């Protein structure tokens, strides 16, 4: 039985991954992390979406301790989401140090114990906010660590890693899911469902990508088909 575990936030990218893999895998598992993020509505969105697509199992992991360990505007309302990170000005304040390291580690533990060999993370390094833990180089190193440390063949998959936001919208269009994603996902750092606040970096990237795709859907579908493996 083909099984896959999706690290699922309830945002545009992870939802696009979920929709894509429902057409490939028989059993889909989702894992969502509550790290005391201010935009908690994404957890409600994740729960609704996974129920809608009738995934095999969806677990929610309490990681509220991360707020006490890691400084970020996503967990501290006193820090502006528009500023640079107070400890590293080359990063946005929305960067949560160690977040994806923890997400991938804990997801690997779950996958190992449920005999799941594929873990999906909907990260992207074309149109992204500059997070170092959303880069392909990071994912490859983390995958090596997990395989060596657990003596397993778990593979990390990042199907959106080389796609622009416009191409990600084209992928949702390919699966006739654009309107669903527009209406039901939470990508906004303010936790506003749908189009979001329109001001945070996440909203800007999402809306800019949507407008580009909408201006020329056939062009971005062609670009998507040149780059994307629809069978994996």
UniProtKB/Swiss-Prot annotation:
Coiled-coil residue spans: none
Q: Which residues bind ATP?
A: 8-18
Keyword entries, A-Z = ATP-binding, Ligase, Metal-binding, Nucleotide-binding, Queuosine biosynthesis, Zinc
Q: What class of enzyme is it?
A: ligase
Q: Which reaction does it catalyse?
A: 7-carboxy-7-deazaguanine + NH4(+) + ATP = 7-cyano-7-deazaguanine + ADP + phosphate + H2O + H(+)
Query: InterPro entries attached here?
Result: QueC (IPR018317), Rossmann-like_a/b/a_fold (IPR014729)
Output the GO biological process annotations, alphabetical, semicolon-separated.
queuosine biosynthetic process
Its Enzyme Commission number(s) read 6.3.4.20
Q: Which cofactor does it need?
A: Zn(2+)
How many cofactors are bound and how?
Binds 1 zinc ion per subunit.
**Gene Ontology molecular function terms on file:** ATP binding; ligase activity, forming carbon-nitrogen bonds; zinc ion binding
Pathway where this protein functions: Purine metabolism; 7-cyano-7-deazaguanine biosynthesis
Fetch the Pfam families from UniProt.
Answer: QueC
Query: Which residues of this UniProt protein bind Zn(2+)?
Result: 188, 197, 200, 203
Protein family per UniProt: Belongs to the QueC family.
Q: What does this protein do?
A: Catalyzes the ATP-dependent conversion of 7-carboxy-7-deazaguanine (CDG) to 7-cyano-7-deazaguanine (preQ(0)).
What protein am I looking at? 7-cyano-7-deazaguanine synthase
Q: Which organism is it from?
A: Buchnera aphidicola subsp. Schizaphis graminum (strain Sg)
